[in-house]
């Protein structure tokens, strides 16, 4: 295996996980903050807000998992070798 390809794969794997976690991290923080604010305004709607929040957090977390899958593919099933 060429050392340059190996080094580039490791760097690309790190970047894919790092960049894939920035957007969902910001989105999850914003969504949780807005959910807490909504529950504070209307405590009777807590169940509906919480259910919607958990579903949206799962969808946002899926984006980070896709970045992890790309990183694992680059590290262990490298298509460039």
Swiss-Prot record:
GO cellular component: chloroplast thylakoid membrane; proton-transporting ATP synthase complex; proton-transporting two-sector ATPase complex, proton-transporting domain
Gene3D superfamilies from the UniProt entry: F1F0 ATP synthase subunit C
Role according to the record: F(1)F(0) ATP synthase produces ATP from ADP in the presence of a proton or sodium gradient. F-type ATPases consist of two structural domains, F(1) containing the extramembraneous catalytic core and F(0) containing the membrane proton channel, linked together by a central stalk and a peripheral stalk. During catalysis, ATP synthesis in the catalytic domain of F(1) is coupled via a rotary mechanism of the central stalk subunits to proton translocation. Key component of the F(0) channel; it plays a direct role in translocation across the membrane. A homomeric c-ring of between 10-14 subunits forms the central stalk rotor element with the F(1) delta and epsilon subunits.
Family: Belongs to the ATPase C chain family.
Pfam short name (any one): ATP-synt_C
Note: In plastids the F-type ATPase is also known as CF(1)CF(0).
Naturally occurring in which organism (per UniProt): Pinus thunbergii
Record key words, sorted: ATP synthesis, CF(0), Chloroplast, Hydrogen ion transport, Ion transport, Lipid-binding, Membrane, Plastid, Thylakoid, Transmembrane, Transmembrane helix, Transport
Transmembrane segments annotated in the record for this chain: 3-23, 57-77
Gene Ontology MF terms: lipid binding; proton-transporting ATP synthase activity, rotational mechanism
Site for Reversibly protonated during proton transport, residues: 61
Disulfide bonds: none
UniProt topology in membrane: Multi-pass membrane protein
SUPFAM superfamilies in the cross-refs: F1F0 ATP synthase subunit C (SSF81333)
Descriptive protein name: ATP synthase subunit c, chloroplastic
């Amino acid at each position: 295996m060429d050392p340059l390809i190996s080094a580039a794969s490791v760097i690309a794997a790190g970047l894919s996980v790092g960049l894939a976690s920035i957007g969902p991290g910001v989105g999850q923080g914003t969504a949780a903050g807005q959910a807490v604010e909504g529950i504070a305004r209307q405590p009777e709607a807590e169940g509906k807000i919480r259910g919607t929040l958990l579903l949206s957090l799962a969808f946002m977390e899926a984006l980070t998992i896709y970045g992890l899958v790309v990183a694992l593919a680059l590290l262990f099933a490298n298509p460039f070798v």
